[in-house]
């Protein structure tokens, strides 16, 4: 007689198999930096299919995601820039770190010119004063796409070397946003009674970070919670984005790089691990924050377009890209230097990546205009600027740079660093 075995563990086996598949899918998304575009795609579909529920959801999560969770992302961005401008970094010498500064100014100037020409052609004089919108660069989006293109997947987060394109474009993006903030400063009214208290808090934050560094505190928690908390509060009181709170704090955290004459010194001093430990521990949490960032901010109704929409898109994706490339070319011709592994083909990809205005362009637009049809046009244009990151990805494939480079060039950065 045949014996039939009845399995009683099949629900558990099925759940384990499903969990493994989900784990593999999540690992693939984090390894290839897909969580941000996934969140943005969900938001875009959701906003156009069920706008009421989406915008209700967005209002609830906007502040904790944009101003708290994103502080972690900007902290990692500051870490990238700080390490590469410190001794031993790809942008350490002034002849190198001034190049992205010049590129930022050139990009903003070209974008402003393109914006003004298009608006003049369309005879929309009311839009002339809104040109600072094209100065905004979404640092988080730029960080995501540049990391996805130039950072080879695999390996532990703390063990990876950054391609110099990453700190280059981040420094460029930060400089462009500083230009934008300076231009809109007269329009950005902050209550006078807030300014004094915020300045004291920021001074206390920087003093705390300096004291921690001076006393060789190697744990990053005091830097984040104490100094970072004071900085966050100062920016919140002042009315700026508190998500930028860690930008002035991370440079005080001990980092891993050393001057060449100290490379073979005693390694028992663990102070240099602080910044690297911070990146290693929070790398995947930052990707989760980017997913929520895309989910909360990328939903837009595909209506309300006009001259402001196309002027913003043309100026940012076209004008700024060309301006950055020209600025880098002029800087190099004047005797400044690109990092060893950065050539003009990489600069072209970086320039396209830097065309994503998104949240900073939205911020500048809402500062310059009251609610109305013109503001709606500009906001839609700002929300469409991430098309630049798609163009950057395609350009990287076409030009064979970053992860699309031939095998012989994939390790070029490591060779230059080791030289």
Tell me what each language-model feature is.
Residues 111-116, 183-187, 236-241, 291-303, ...:
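Hydrophobic alpha-helical transmembrane segments in multi-pass integral membrane proteins
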Residues 26, 57-58, 82-99, 121-126, ...:
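Interfacial helix-loop-helix linkers and transmembrane-helix boundary segments
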Residues 3-32, 45-55, 204-208, 215, ...:
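Predominantly late transmembrane helices and immediately cytosolic-facing juxtamembrane segments
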Residues 84-116, 193-205, 304-321, 344-351, ...:
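Entry/N-cap segments of selected transmembrane alpha helices
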Residues 45-57, 76-92, 109-131, 152-153:
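Transmembrane alpha-helix boundary signature
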Residues 24-30, 55-66, 94-99, 124-133, ...:
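Interfacial loop-to-helix junctions that mark the boundaries of transmembrane helices
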Residues 80, 110-111, 134-168, 176-182, ...:
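Short helical (or helix-break) motifs at transmembrane helix termini and adjacent helical loops
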Residues 150-254:
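Functional cores that coordinate and move charged inorganic groups
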């Amino acid at each position: 007689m045949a014996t039939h075995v009845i399995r009683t563990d099949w629900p558990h086996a099925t759940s384990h198999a499903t969990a493994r598949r989900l784990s593999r899918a999540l690992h693939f998304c984090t390894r290839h930096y897909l969580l941000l575009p996934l969140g943005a795609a969900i938001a875009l579909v959701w906003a156009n299919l069920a706008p009421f529920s989406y915008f209700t959801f967005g209002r609830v999560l906007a502040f904790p995601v944009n101003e708290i969770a994103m502080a972690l992302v900007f902290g990692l961005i500051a870490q990238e820039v700080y390490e590469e401008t410190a001794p031993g970094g790809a942008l350490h010498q002034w002849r190198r770190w001034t190049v992205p500064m010049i590129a930022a100014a050139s990009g903003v100037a070209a974008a402003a010119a393109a914006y003004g020409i298009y608006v003049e052609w369309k005879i929309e004089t009311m839009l002339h004063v809104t040109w600072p919108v094209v100065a905004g660069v979404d640092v988080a989006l730029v960080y995501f796409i540049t990391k996805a293109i130039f950072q080879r997947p695999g390996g532990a987060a703390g063990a990876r070397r950054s391609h110099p394109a990453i700190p280059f474009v981040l420094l460029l993006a930060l400089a462009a946003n500083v230009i934008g903030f300076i231009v809109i400063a007269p329009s950005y009214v902050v209550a006078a009674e807030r300014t004094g208290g915020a300045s004291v808090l920021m001074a206390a934050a920087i003093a705390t970070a300096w004291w921690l560094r001076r006393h060789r505190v190697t744990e990053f928690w005091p830097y984040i919670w104490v100094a970072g908390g004071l900085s966050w509060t100062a920016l919140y009181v002042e009315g700026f984005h508190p998500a930028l709170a860690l930008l002035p704090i991370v440079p005080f955290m001990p980092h891993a790089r050393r001057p060449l004459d100290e490379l073979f010194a005693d390694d028992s001093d663990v102070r240099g691990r602080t910044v690297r430990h911070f990146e290693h521990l929070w790398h995947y949490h930052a990707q989760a924050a980017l997913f929520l960032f895309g989910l909360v901010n990328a939903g837009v109704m595909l209506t309300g377009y006009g001259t402001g929409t196309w002027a913003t898109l043309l100026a940012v994706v076209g004008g700024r890209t060309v301006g950055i490339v020209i600025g880098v070319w002029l800087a190099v011709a004047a005797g400044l230097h690109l990092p060893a592994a950065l050539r003009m083909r990489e600069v072209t990809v970086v320039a396209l990546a830097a065309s994503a205005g998104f949240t900073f362009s939205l911020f500048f637009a809402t500062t310059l205009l009251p609610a109305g049809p013109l503001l709606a046009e500009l906001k839609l244009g700002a929300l469409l600027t991430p098309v630049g990151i798609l163009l950057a990805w395609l350009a990287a494939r076409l030009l064979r740079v970053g992860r699309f480079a031939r095998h012989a060039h994939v390790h070029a950065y490591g060779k230059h660093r080791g030289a």
